[in-house]
């Protein structure tokens, strides 16, 4: 009998521009449809780190070109935009691959809002990398000119970081669950979900943040009662001593081993750390689950 699988695609694995993304989603669709053909149910989430950074940069440049006409675009709206265009490419690539193999199965992208706590300490200590990699000189200029927070990202360059609060709940979870139970292939929680928090009454207000897609995917996998959570990245495997002469790739880990490596500081915050933490949390959430 097939399993119910949540697949979390890394934003960096989707390419750095639209042509690269088109190629990446076609390759991804083939692998996902292989699983579907084997009888598994698949739900897809994805990151948006490079993409949301590009969107916000473009909107900021537009504002600077005519500040009397345009206003800066809130980060939550940039996340929504990224969900739309990444979901559009993924949805069409999956549909095409399914039809090419003679499989009649619907594909739907859900514009997904995820509730966060406005008092989350992540709003004070930003850790989520977004946008393109920069040299040290470029990063210093962004700090001076725009007041960005930046970090060195796992030896690959410098990036802007923004708040990344923990996901509390998925607003559209009932709709997602209904679609999955009806047999659709669902794309949800893109970019970790549009970050929102509750105000007076039933109003949801966008938050200036990007939720880590690994934690959001963990919540999604739990709430759709998945058997397996698969987190894909731009690197081959999880590693200890990453980027050092004694680097070691890891084929598998127990939750206790993972916690030990976390305590040793082996995994970079905002990069591999949330992936390992999300995998541990999901694997321990119910008997028989794996990540």
Residue positions per predicted region:
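Short beta-strand segments at enzyme active-site cores
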Residues: 6-8, 41-54, 106-111, 186-189, ...
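Polyanion-binding loop/helix "lid" in catalytic or ligand-binding cores
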Residues: 23-30, 74-98, 163-180, 186-195, ...
């Amino acid at each position: 009998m097939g399993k119910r699988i949540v697949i979390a695609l890394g934003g960096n694995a989707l390419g750095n521009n639209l042509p690269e993304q088109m190629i990446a989603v076609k390759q991804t669709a083939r692998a996902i449809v292989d699983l579907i053909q084997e009888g598994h149910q698949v739900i897809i989430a994805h990151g948006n780190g490079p993409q949301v950074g590009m969107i916000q940069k473009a909107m900021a440049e537009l504002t600077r070109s005519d500040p009397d006409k345009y206003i800066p675009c809130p980060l939550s709206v940039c996340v929504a935009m990224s969900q739309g265009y990444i979901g559009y490419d993924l949805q069409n690539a999956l549909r095409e691959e399914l039809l090419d193999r003679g499989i009649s199965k619907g594909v739907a992208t859900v514009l997904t809002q995820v509730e966060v706590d406005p008092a989350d300490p992540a709003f004070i200590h930003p850790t989520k990398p977004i946008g393109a990699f920069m040299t040290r000189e470029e990063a210093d200029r962004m700090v001076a000119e725009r007041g960005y927070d930046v970090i060195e990202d796992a030896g690959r360059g410098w990036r802007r970081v923004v708040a990344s609060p923990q996901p509390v709940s998925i607003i559209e979870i009932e709709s997602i669950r209904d679609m999955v139970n009806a047999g659709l292939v669902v794309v949800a929680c893109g970019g970790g979900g549009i970050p929102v928090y509750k105000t007076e009454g039933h109003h949801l207000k966008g938050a200036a943040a990007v939720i880590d897609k690994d934690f959001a995917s963990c919540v999604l996998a739990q709430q759709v009662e998945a058997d397996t959570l698969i987190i894909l990245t731009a690197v081959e495997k999880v590693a200890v001593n990453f980027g050092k002469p004694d680097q070691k790739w890891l084929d598998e880990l127990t939750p206790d081993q993972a916690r030990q490596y976390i305590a040793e500081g082996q995994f970079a915050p905002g990069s591999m750390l949330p992936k390992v933490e999300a995998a541990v949390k999901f694997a321990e959430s119910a008997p028989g689950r794996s990540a």
